[in-house]
Amino acid sequence: TRIIENRLFVMNLNFTYFLLIVMSLFLHPAFSEQKEAKPTLGKLYEKMAEASFEILINGRLEGTGFLIDQDGHAATVWHAAKRKGNLEVRSQILGRLSAKIIAHDRGHDLTLIELPSRDKPYPYLPVSKKNAGPGHPVYLMGTPIFRHQVFITGHVARKGTTFEYFDGNFVEGIHVAALTPGGCSGGPWSNRMGEVVGMQAASMTLPSGHQGIATMIPPKAIRQLLEKKENIFPATLQMAVEEIWGQDGNYIKTIPQGTKGLVVRQLQKEGTAAKAGVKEWDIVLKVDGRIIEETDTFIRHLRRKVPGDLLRLELMSKDGSDKRKVKVKLSPLK
């Protein structure tokens, strides 16, 4: 009986300790602050609307942007901001203001712009220090097809980043399950706390229409450009690669059975790879001595290098002939 009583006493004591720990967590200031800081969706919309704006070039609406500090620095997409002409921003809160380009990073389709200085701090969205994980809900403020301040919900569709080829180069981004019409490019993707976890850059489309997947630029790239405030030029081969299993069935029939590698596509005439002897539809058998079969792995390897470095490629024609080795001097992606 005494043993049973002792065990019950220990169990009651452990349960008491457990309750005290749980209560202390709920009463801890950091927990309370975090709980209070989580805005309603209505408040989140208002916060994002205050810090977002439309991009105008020569008076025409070309995309979206958003403020990322109180001094008037803001982010938008390079594929819109690069267009020549008078750059302005417009919103119900800001009115219509002139803006200037400070720096860009084509490897992330990203442009840092600056609004006119003023005494009153600008409303802005803080940029998260980490990516949102797979399945997490995210919220986009955009300007779809000339409509204003539209709030779009999505979910992060993969872990980590991937690379998509558009606007003439590979862009690093994160997939989001969401329908994002044209005009949303440059808009902020936010988490539930109102922190920027990405910037809308592109959509997965076919001639039949949107495929339900969007690409957002990772927050790390936005923070980096804001900190540097100067152009970032990643290394480029001035060509693209595609995976063998993604090719047309007739192409796959022409290549030797068991071939491993990547297919050369979008080879730029007079580009650095073309000058080194690379040809359209070549198969890249090895990269710096490694067999690489996935595009993401290839681009990550490339992005670890800097302009001026050499990349060693082992190539062959699609029918297995003309095997050769070339060295390509990497160019800056400007």
Residue ranges with predicted function:
Residues 34-45, 99, 122, 144, ...:
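C-terminal cap/linker of serine protease catalytic domains
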Residues 179, 230-286, 290-297, 301, ...:
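PDZ/PDZ-like groove recognition
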Residues 43-47, 104-108, 159-174, 228-233, ...:
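Gly/Ser-enriched beta-turn/beta-hairpin loop segments
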Residues 30-58:
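Protease-domain processing segments flanking chymotrypsin-fold serine proteases, especially trypsin-like
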Residues 52, 58-62, 67-150, 173, ...:
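Conserved active-site neighborhood of the chymotrypsin/trypsin-like protease fold
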Residues 47-54, 116-124, 150-215, 219, ...:
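Active-site region of chymotrypsin-like
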Residues 72, 135-141, 194, 273, ...:
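A structural signal for short beta-strand/turn segments enriched in small hydrophobics and glycine
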Residues 17-26:
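Bacterial N-terminal signal peptides
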